């Protein structure tokens, strides 16, 4: 599959963005650090058509080296984030995943595992789900839709059934069950140019459809497709980049600015570079800071 370099992606976005001053306005970071997000590499047991990090089974060479893992462990102690967010690829495939989880939990940090669900069924990771429950890791599980057809179309044949099997496994361990304290959030990420408009009726449909298949969850959230990586390439091939950016512009909600992830998050790449968010990480727009030495004073109030 062809791919676009970060430089090519930035150029395409720049040439297709609406010519408005609002796109040049800066934001200011909040004080402190709420989320330390660690991208452990693009290795994944799946290869989804919409993936904004170009993850797949052929990405073992992108895994975070142990020297950077150690810097992440040290940064947890120095920065004292409220939440450590582990992402990838499939972060669980990194050999230091459990070490990072244990260290974060020992410091009192909440931990989120951004999980594709099917990774929980790999024979080599048979004890992974019990480990997550034991460490009380919060799971944000990606599932395009509660129906089989659209899920398989985006993620491959058989992935819907495998995802349901993994969800039932998590339910048996207490995830998604009232009063257990084990949080299971489903994240819907539809393919193509469709924008998420999750309503209370949508959540009712999700709960009813999945309950009929023996699955329960705590929360449902939605994510729209960022026009980068594989999705940007698809838009370019269909000559739809400008139209999609205009659609995003039309859906802009100014009330969302105060809660943007870049204002309270520090994103770390597998190579140890620092970014405001993982989307900027994929576009190679780093911060002028070093993981080994960054402190809270470097982050608070900084312009984005």
Language-model regions, residue ranges each:
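Short, surface-exposed charged micro-motifs
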Residues: 39, 265-267
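Radical SAM enzyme [4Fe-4S]-AdoMet core and its adjacent flexible, acidic
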Residues: 147-261
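Short loop/turn motifs at secondary-structure junctions
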Residues: 47, 80, 135-136, 180-183, ...
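Conserved alpha-helical substructure of the radical SAM core
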Residues: 4-88, 92-106
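Core AdoMet radical
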Residues: 35, 55-64, 79-94, 105-124, ...
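Conserved strand-to-helix beginnings and helix N-cap segments that scaffold or border functional pockets
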Residues: 94-98, 125-126, 196-200
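C-terminal accessory region of radical SAM enzymes
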Residues: 216-248, 266, 273-275, 279-304
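A broadly conserved sequence feature marking short terminus-proximal activation segments
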Residues: 1-20, 264, 271-290
């Amino acid at each position: 599959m062809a791919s676009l370099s970060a430089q090519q992606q930035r150029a395409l976005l720049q040439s297709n963005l609406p010519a408005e001053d609002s796109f040049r306005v800066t934001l200011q970071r909040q004080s402190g650090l709420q989320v330390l997000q660690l991208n452990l590499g693009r290795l994944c047991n799946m290869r989804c058509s919409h993936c904004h990090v170009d993850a797949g089974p052929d990405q073992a060479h992108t895994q975070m080296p142990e020297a950077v893992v150690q810097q992440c462990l040290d940064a947890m102690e120095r920065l004292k984030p409220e939440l450590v967010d582990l992402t990838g690829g499939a972060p669980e495939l990194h050999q230091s995943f459990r070490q990072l989880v244990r260290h974060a939990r020992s410091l009192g940090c909440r931990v989120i595992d951004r999980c594709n669900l099917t990774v929980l069924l790999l024979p080599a990771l048979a004890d992974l789900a019990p480990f997550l429950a034991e460490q009380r890791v919060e799971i944000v599980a990606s599932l395009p839709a509660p129906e089989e057809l659209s899920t398989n179309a985006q993620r491959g044949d058989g992935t819907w059934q495998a995802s349901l099997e993994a969800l039932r496994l998590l339910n048996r361990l207490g995830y998604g069950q009232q009063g257990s304290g084990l949080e299971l959030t489903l994240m819907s990420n539809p393919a193509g140019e469709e924008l998420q408009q999750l309503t209370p009726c949508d959540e009712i449909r999700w709960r009813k459809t999945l309950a009929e298949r023996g699955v329960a969850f705590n929360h449902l959230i939605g994510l729209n497709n960022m026009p980068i990586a594989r999705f940007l390439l698809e838009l370019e091939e269909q000559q739809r980049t400008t139209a999609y950016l205009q659609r995003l512009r039309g859906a802009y909600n100014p009330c969302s600015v105060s809660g943007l992830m870049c204002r309270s998050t520090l994103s770390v790449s597998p190579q140890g570079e620092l970014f405001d968010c993982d989307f900027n990480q994929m576009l190679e727009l780093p911060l002028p800071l070093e993981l080994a030495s960054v402190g809270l004073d470097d982050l608070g109030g900084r312009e984005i």
